[in-house]
From Swiss-Prot:
Pathway: Xenobiotic degradation; atrazine degradation
Protein task: Important for the activity of the AtzE subunit of 1-carboxybiuret hydrolase.
Domain of life where this protein originates: Bacteria
One GO-annotated biological process of the protein: atrazine catabolic process
Entry keyword annotation includes Transferase: no
Keyword line: Plasmid
Recorded name of the encoding gene: atzG
Organism in which the protein naturally occurs: Pseudomonas sp. (strain ADP)
Subunit comment: Heterotetramer consisting of 2 AtzE and 2 AtzG subunits.
Protein name per the record: 1-carboxybiuret hydrolase subunit AtzG
UniProt entry tagged with the keyword Cell inner membrane: no
């Protein structure tokens, strides 16, 4: 997204959720949004093997049987 598109998105989103933003505040939010998008892009570029992926559901291994 370009800076203009991000700013337009921030303005539209603030109206949609009912949060009034002055233009200066909207520009600050757009700046932080751009930085967050850049960080996400950097994370997405790191290759992951299937072993690196998080499991959808955590299921701990059962405890070993104890001899009583």
């Amino acid at each position: 997204m370009t800076e203009t598109e991000i700013f337009a998105y921030i303005e539209a989103a603030s109206i949609a959720i009912g949060i009034p933003l002055e233009p200066a505040r909207a520009r600050a939010v757009a700046h932080h949004f751009s930085r967050t998008a850049l960080l996400a892009e950097m994370l997405e570029s790191v290759p992951l093997s299937p072993e690196s992926e998080l499991a959808e559901i955590y299921r701990p291994a059962p405890f070993p049987a104890e001899d009583i």
